Swiss-Prot record:
This is Baculoviral IAP repeat-containing protein 5. It comes from Sus scrofa. Its main location: cytoplasm. PROSITE patterns: BIR_REPEAT_2. The keyword Phosphoprotein applies. The gene is BIRC5. The modification Phosphothreonine is found at T34, T48, T117. The modification Phosphoserine is found at S20. Pfam families: BIR (PF00653). One of its GO terms (cellular component) is midbody. The record marks E126 as: Interaction with FBXL7.
Length: 142
C-alpha cells in the first residue's frame, strides 16, 4: 500500500518540492539566489514570457522579479512582505503539530483568497473602465 499523497497546496510546504519548480532558473552556483536558497525563503519559480525570473512565495503569494545574482532571498522576502508568517516559522514543517500546521495553513488560505479577490477586483475595474469608454463613445456618436 502506497503512502497517501499530499494535496498540491500542501506539497509546497516541502522545500524539495519548491526547489523542483526552479527549472531554467538563471542563477545557480556562485549566486546568492540559488534555487535552494530561493526555496528555503518560501519561493517557487513561476516564470512568464516577459518575466523569466518571476518567483512567488507559496505562503503570502508575494511575487518578485528582477532578481540580481547577489540578492539574498530571505532579505528580499522580508523587505517586500515583512508580515509573511512563513518567515517566522522556526521549525521544519515536518516537525509541526497538526494544530500548528492547520493554524498556519489557515493563514496561507486567507492570503490566497485575498490575492484572488484583489486580482478579480482589478479585472472588474479594468472591464468597467472599458465598458464606460464604450458607452461614452456611443453617447458621443449620437
Amino acid at each position: 500500500m502506497s503512502a497517501p499523497s499530499l494535496p498540491p497546496a500542501w506539497q509546497l510546504y516541502l522545500k524539495d518540492h519548491r526547489i523542483s519548480t526552479f527549472k531554467n532558473w538563471p542563477f545557480l552556483e556562485g549566486c546568492a539566489c540559488t534555487p535552494e536558497r530561493m526555496a528555503a525563503a518560501g519561493f517557487i519559480h513561476c516564470p512568464t514570457e516577459n518575466e523569466p525570473d518571476l518567483a512567488q512565495c507559496f505562503f503570502c503569494f508575494k511575487e518578485l522579479e528582477g532578481w540580481e545574482p547577489d540578492d539574498d532571498p530571505i532579505e528580499e522576502h522580508k523587505k517586500h512582505s515583512s508580515g509573511c508568517a512563513f518567515l517566522s516559522v522556526k521549525k521544519q514543517f515536518e516537525e509541526l503539530t497538526l494544530s500548528e500546521f492547520l493554524k498556519l495553513d489557515k493563514e496561507r488560505a486567507k492570503n490566497k483568497i485575498a490575492k484572488e479577490t484583489n486580482n478579480k477586483q482589478k479585472e472588474f475595474e479594468e472591464t468597467a473602465k472599458k465598458v464606460r469608454c464604450a458607452i461614452e463613445q456611443l453617447a458621443a456618436s449620437e
